[in-house]
Amino acid sequence: KRIEHAIQKKQRILVYGDYDVDGTTSVAMMYLFLKKYNKNIQYYIPCRYEEGYGISKKGIDYAYKTKISLIIALDCGIRAVNEINYAKKMGIDFIICDHHRPSEKIPVAAAVLNPKQTDCKYPYKELSGCGVGFKLIQAYCQKNKISFDQIVEYLDLLAISVGADIVPITGENRVFAFYGLKQINLSPRIGLQVLIEGLGKKKPFSISDMIFGVAPRINAAGRIQHANKAVEVLVEQDYNLAKVFAKEIEEQNNRRKELDQKITKEAVEMIDQNKNSTVLFSDKWHKGVVGIVASRLIESYYRPTIVFSEKNGILTGSARSVHDFDIYNAISKCSYLLEKYGGHKYAAGLTIKKKNIYLFIDKFEKVVSETISKDQQSPKIEVDMEININDVNEKFFRIIKQFAPFGPRNLSPVFISRGVFDNGYAKQIGDDKSHLRLNIKTERGSIPSVGFGMGEFFEKIKNGKKFDVCYSIQENIWNGRT
């Protein structure tokens, strides 16, 4: 009703979202939809460095100055009790579409959509932020007798949000990902088309291409400069202008990679190997890549990890967890030391004053040590089946492909084959020789294979040495060959 009222009265609406992939795809989707019915639509993405995550007073002040009467918050807002009260005093209403865990106190807004609310009866709880926004659009269309065909066009954005935000690819998310990928392969929107062209790959595109190819580029805009650039490219209708935006994003992504490598190297040298957790900080680290660095550190030191950047006595960090350990709960037990925090079981963001950081490091280590199990501290490969390497062929892959799209809770099957060997052409690849390319010998020839981050194993498999290998199977088309 509040959206209908705003459209009928031609009130100004602000679409407000987070600066990550889920947030920017949500904003692009809602902006494009509402623009059809009300020309008084703007969007706002907070600056990662000046405002931080979520609803900011600066954003609300901007809304007030531009005479906004309704803010639709996407992928954020569920914990913004004070900020939404602040907006209410200014005569601005809020609709919240979020999927993060709520605190005990829910903001007083015109509407709060979040399937993780304890009293929410919606049957599927694992929607992405973009997914929650899509359900709002869907409900609006049902109420106003607008055909579902009118909103199918947004499934491409929805598929990218599902893949990038690491939500389970089950239930509705699986449907969104499947049909969204179908749309991406048939007729992607111009903004996605130019980003996909930058991958240098040919169709068909998979959810992995979106997660590891498109998503980092969208994220790079908010990490290095401002996420507005990501929304600009996603909503752009002009191909040539979209190409210009995509080129800028590509440059930012390259810069992000450089910072990622540099900071990871510095962080590894600072790690205390005798702890159950890792918490590191530096005023020289770029705020935009600390989450990536935290993930990288877990690859080498498998334990709950938080990496902070520092500016003006305030530390802003990203937390990443290991299998089945709830890092959000662990951080919650240290919340009295924090300025703010939010997130999921496996990833979270937090802000703390520098004067409290060493107290936090000690408390977090204590919490982790008391709650983490031995099993959670050991990286594992969950294997679905042992098979003979000779069974891997196109027919076998066609069967596997029927289970796609793959992702959390619907992972690509992992197989193990024993006593295999390379055909003699194995080599280390990548600028730093950190990856491994090999051809595993079979009765019918060989299977091209890549081991990312496995360059160190080259000596163990060269010269025909036999080895056991765990792997998943993907299709790669190059120069007409599959």
Task: Name every feature range the model reports, one short phrase each.
Residues 444-462:
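Beta-strand/loop nucleic-acid-binding surfaces
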Residues 29, 107-146, 151-164:
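Short alpha-helices
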Residues 80-81, 165:
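Intrinsically disordered, low-complexity regulatory tails of plant transcription factors
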Residues 72, 219, 400, 471:
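A residue-level signal for conserved active-site and pocket-lining positions in enzyme catalytic cores
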Residues 49-51, 80, 100-105, 119-120, ...:
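Short gly/pro/ser/thr-enriched loop/turn and capping motifs at secondary-structure boundaries
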Residues 387-447:
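Accessory interdomain/linker segments of ATP-dependent helicases and helicase-like nucleic-acid enzymes
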Residues 465-479:
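Flexible glycine-rich surface loops and low-complexity tracts that mediate binding to linear polymers
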Residues 1-70, 90-91, 141-362, 370, ...:
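Hydrophobic helix-and-loop "lid/oligomerization" segment in the mid-to-C-terminal part
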